Amino acid sequence: MHEKYGNVVRIGPNQVSVASPEAFHHVFVTRCSSFLKTDFYATIQPGIGPNYAGLFNYINHKQAMAERRDLQPLFSPGSLKHYEARFDEQLDILMEVAKQREKVDLFGLFKFFMLDVIGDLALNKSFGQVTSGKEHQYVIDFNNAFMVIGLQNTFAPIIPLIPYLPFKKLKNAYYGLQRVFSYSQERVEDYLKQDMSKKQGSLMSGYLDPATGEPKDGYSAWSIALAGHGFIVAGSEATSITLTYIIWMLIKRPDVDQRLRQELSRLSKNYSNTDLANLPYLDAVIRETLRIYPPAPAPMPRVVPKSGFEFEGVSYPPGTVISAQPYTIHRHEGVFEDPDEFRPERWLDVPSEKKDRMYRAFIPFSAGQRG
């Protein structure tokens, strides 16, 4: 669509889609506090009804920033180092299970693995899927619940009527979604009963008063359950998708695989996350995979503020919905030459100006304070 009609395409009465990295940066980064998320984010929340929130779903910018400040210390380099040991424990389990099998469904195993990791890091309790080899009921219910989440976005008034409709699958999805949050709340309640010494360092500890171990003002067990669910879904799905695509590309490209193996062979036996961060080709392979296969390729709608918006000589009135998607921007030929070609080397040994342009246009998980 953008190849045919240009950087800006009108896709509805008051909606436009943009494929320009410059327009994206202005809307999502420079003026992210002015270009607010649309009501779409309220309707895709996994709870029944539009009144629940989470860090990704907040439309209110100040509310989102307050929660972000509480969580920011948990993603500092020091905190990430603390997570390494716990991650390695889950990785050892993964490797042991994989060695016992002749054939491995990598995507399925990665999904099990990442859910176990995030469950442990967020609430101090792994789901144990890698060991059991079975999908946890929580995951089954949530996957089925997407039927309800989709309806919530398009036919919200129908949601309360689902229990009375003669559609078994839809009813199962509805009640499954309720079980998802009942389970999340049970996990959080168990988590809150733990000693603060155990809770410190977990992803959910940012919501707690360090002196009492209880939820800070503005949070409750229910809101923490919603946040925990958000961490689990985002952390497990996006990472497992990316890991699978990386392996797939290495299989398709033996030359890339060989060069990456050579770089990895220089690591010491007890390497750390810091050591990995200093491997330029590994970084390039990951970036190039995320560029071609962003795990969240969908549009991210924003609303033009009262001051309006002008781009490439065209004025957009207040209330206009502007959307952009990583998939399209990552294929902008003005930034990425031969954009459909998997070429990790494009990130290495390039002039600083060109590298800066690529980094600004690299948005696999969106960009700016709101994502």
Task: Walk through the language-model features, giving the residues of each.
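Cytochrome P450 heme-thiolate "Cys pocket" and heme-binding signature region
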Residues: 53, 229, 234, 273-277, ...
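Cytochrome P450 core scaffold surrounding the K-helix E-X-X-R motif
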Residues: 24-30, 34, 128, 327-341
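Cytochrome P450 I-helix active-site segment
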Residues: 84, 88, 134-144, 198-205, ...
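Cytochrome P450 catalytic-core helices
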Residues: 114, 238-263
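Cytochrome P450 substrate-recognition site 1
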Residues: 1-82, 115-116, 134-162
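Conserved cytochrome P450 K-helix/beta-meander segment immediately N-terminal to the heme-binding cysteine loop
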Residues: 306, 324-353
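Cytochrome P450 heme-thiolate monooxygenase catalytic core
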Residues: 37-48, 81-243
